[in-house]
Amino acid sequence: LVWPDLVARVADATNAPGMVAVYNSVNYMDPDNFLWQSYHSSQAGSWANASQFKNAEIDKLLEDGRATVDADARKKIYDDAQTKIVDAAVELWLYCEIANDAWVTQLGKTPTNANSDIRLLEYSAS
């Protein structure tokens, strides 16, 4: 199944495959970045929420987390959301990639975007 066909099929719950292998990562270091696209009901049928998962209680937690600026309060909200997602057995997480990345200062300064995947960073020699 090629990617465009998969994206089209998961949009319709009656046509979606029973199992989909998807690698997903964050664009920036915030739980909202991953959890919203993967588990908020508004995203059901997108490639990131191919399971068509919908849960009003988790939606409320994710919405509260998105609207809260206090770091400790946000952590509790997202901890609760993640526990409920795991308890709902939404998906089967097979593994998490562990990567050890390094760079040498002779290549330039630190990465230009410290919140991004280091494999995608650009370096400046100046």
Regions found by a protein language model. Name each.
Residues 9-126:
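Detector for C-terminal structural segments
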Residues 1-8:
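Short helix-initiation/N-cap motifs at beta->coil->alpha
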